[in-house]
């Protein structure tokens, strides 16, 4: 039988939905030579903002 360990859910992760602009969008990002450009066509479901669909 393996020893039990204590897990704290509040360390490093909080459940919930965050605004896309606050978590992923970085307007001042400077591209590098090693960056890869990929393009995808996304169609949001009714009631979902386009920026949240991707």
From Swiss-Prot:
Residues found modified as N-acetylproline: 3
Example GO BP: reductive pentose-phosphate cycle
Modified residues (N6,N6,N6-trimethyllysine): 14
GO cellular component: chloroplast
Catalytic activity: 2 (2R)-3-phosphoglycerate + 2 H(+) = D-ribulose 1,5-bisphosphate + CO2 + H2O; D-ribulose 1,5-bisphosphate + O2 = 2-phosphoglycolate + (2R)-3-phosphoglycerate + 2 H(+)
Maturation propeptide residues: 1-2
Enzyme class: lyase
EC number: 4.1.1.39
InterPro entries in UniProt: RuBisCO, RuBisCO_lsu_fd_N, RuBisCO_lsu_N_sf
Pfam families per UniProt: RuBisCO_large_N (PF02788)
Keyword Lyase among UniProt keywords: yes
GO molecular function, a single term: monooxygenase activity
Cellular localisation: Plastid, Chloroplast
Subunit structure: Heterohexadecamer of 8 large chains and 8 small chains.
Family that this chain belongs to: Belongs to the RuBisCO large chain family. Type I subfamily.
Note: The basic functional RuBisCO is composed of a large chain homodimer in a 'head-to-tail' conformation. In form I RuBisCO this homodimer is arranged in a barrel-like tetramer with the small subunits forming a tetrameric 'cap' on each end of the 'barrel'.
Protein task: RuBisCO catalyzes two reactions: the carboxylation of D-ribulose 1,5-bisphosphate, the primary event in carbon dioxide fixation, as well as the oxidative fragmentation of the pentose substrate in the photorespiration process. Both reactions occur simultaneously and in competition at the same active site.
Identification of the protein by name: Ribulose bisphosphate carboxylase large chain
Name of the gene encoding the protein in the UniProt record: rbcL
